[in-house]
């Protein structure tokens, strides 16, 4: 929780003039980073957007939004694979841009079944997709966080700010 608070303070500072800003987390879990950001900005001055592969985590985030006065953002909470099928897009199909993006992505994950699909998307994953599969028992993992870093950068508006927890 302390890391979330520090990230929010660094991104937002004490800017009381912010209004109508968008905040996004592509690997939100239960929303700790997003809630810290909303508290720093002011719950009535921001909209929350998220995606997480876990339905259970997404449901917990919805509950957290209700408990923290952010129920207007409930329709923006999506479950799914952010890297393979990002849920938040503009009308023209491009990745939606946000004022603030925070993320604590998975660091290592077994994703060889869709690695080549991600690698083929040279626009979104312009810095590449991990090749090396490290043998870690019981199954191989790859440094998937590098893909999330690229997704975060692609999701920032031209004046947007982001913060990512990395190993």
Feature locations, PLM:
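Conserved S-adenosyl-L-methionine
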Residues: 2-103, 108-112, 116-119, 166-167
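Compositionally biased, intrinsically disordered low-complexity regions
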Residues: 15, 130, 162-164
């Amino acid at each position: 929780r302390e890391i979330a608070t520090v990230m929010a303070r660094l991104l937002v500072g004490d800017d009381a003039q912010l209004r109508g800003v968008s905040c996004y987390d592509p690997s939100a879990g239960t929303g700790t980073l997003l809630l810290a950001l909303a508290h720093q900005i002011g719950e009535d001055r921001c909209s929350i957007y998220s995606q997480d592969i876990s339905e259970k985590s997404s449901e917990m985030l919805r509950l957290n939004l209700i408990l923290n006065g952010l129920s207007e953002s409930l329709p923006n909470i999506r479950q799914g694979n952010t890297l393979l099928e990002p849920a938040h897009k503009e009308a023209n199909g491009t990745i939606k841009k946000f004022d603030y993006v925070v993320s604590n992505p998975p660091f290592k994950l077994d994703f060889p079944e869709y690695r080549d699909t991600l690698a083929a998307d040279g626009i979104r994953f312009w810095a590449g997709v991990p090749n090396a599969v490290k043998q870690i028992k019981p199954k191989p993992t790859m440094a998937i966080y590098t893909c999330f870093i690229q997704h975060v950068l692609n999701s920032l508006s031209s004046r947007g700010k982001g913060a990512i927890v990395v190993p």
